[in-house]
Curated annotation (Swiss-Prot):
SS bonds (residue pairs): 36-39, 100-126
UniProt source species: Pseudomonas entomophila (strain L48)
InterPro entries: DiS_bond_form_DsbB/BdbC, Disulphide_bond_form_DsbB, DsbB, DsbB-like_sf
Localization in the cell: Cell inner membrane
Biological processes, Gene Ontology terms: protein folding
Keyword annotations: Cell inner membrane, Cell membrane, Chaperone, Disulfide bond, Electron transport, Membrane, Oxidoreductase, Redox-active center, Transmembrane, Transmembrane helix, Transport
Pfam families found in the cross-reference section: DsbB
Superkingdom as given in the UniProt entry: Bacteria
UniProt record similarity statement: Belongs to the DsbB family.
Transmembrane portions of the chain: 10-26, 45-61, 68-85, 141-159
Identification of the protein by name: Disulfide bond formation protein B 2
Protein task: Required for disulfide bond formation in some periplasmic proteins. Acts by oxidizing the DsbA protein.
Organism lineage: Bacteria, Pseudomonadati, Pseudomonadota, Gammaproteobacteria, Pseudomonadales
Length: 168
């Protein structure tokens, strides 16, 4: 497969993930939304997705490497979708999370296990709905973005599989 065909998948994926990251930082710095623990986790997964796409663009691997990069991109998008789905679920049932909200500075002084638990399972501030657009909350938009980003490598992997079978 030519370099142009490889870039036709990874370049739009990189641009889309970068656009979503820029939008999330815009909502924080300009609009004034304060991100919760799950929002930070979703940003991390989005950054991993963008870095995988950037590495694939720079590296220009052979067939096995393209599949590996597409698999890594799919895994990071799937992980982000799981986190966003958890966030949507928490907002749908606010009784699930209890406790009090701690500033990030205090959270980082806690043991690593508690930090990971908070960033993966959510914290009490994750249940508040502070912004919506077209009747979708920010975690719902995030879930939609991750599902669309996951469709890119998934469609490439499925098409690769069918091309490989057709050639055999």
């Amino acid at each position: 497969m030519s370099l142009a065909c490889l870039r036709s998948f990874f370049l739009p994926a990189l641009l889309a993930s970068t656009a979503v990251l820029v939008a999330s930082f815009h909502l924080e710095s300009v609009v004034g939304l304060v991100p919760c623990a799950l929002c930070f986790s979703q940003r991390l997964m989005l950054g991993v997705y963008a870095l995988v796409c950037l590495a694939a663009l720079v590296h220009s691997p052979a067939a096995r490497g393209r599949r590996a990069y597409a698999g890594l991109a799919l895994a990071s998008a799937f992980g982000g979708a799981l986190l966003a789905g958890r966030h949507v679920w928490l907002q749908g049932d606010p009784q699930v999370v209890d406790g009090c909200h701690l500033p990030v500075e205090q959270v980082l002084q806690r043991p690593l296990g508690e930090i990971l638990q908070m960033f993966l399972l959510g914290s009490p501030d994750c249940v508040s709905i502070s912004w919506s657009f077209l009747d979708l909350t920010l975690p719902e938009w995030s879930l939609l973005a991750f599902l669309l980003l996951a469709a890119m490598p998934l469609s490439w992997l499925v098409a690769y599989r069918f091309r490989k079978r057709a050639m055999a």
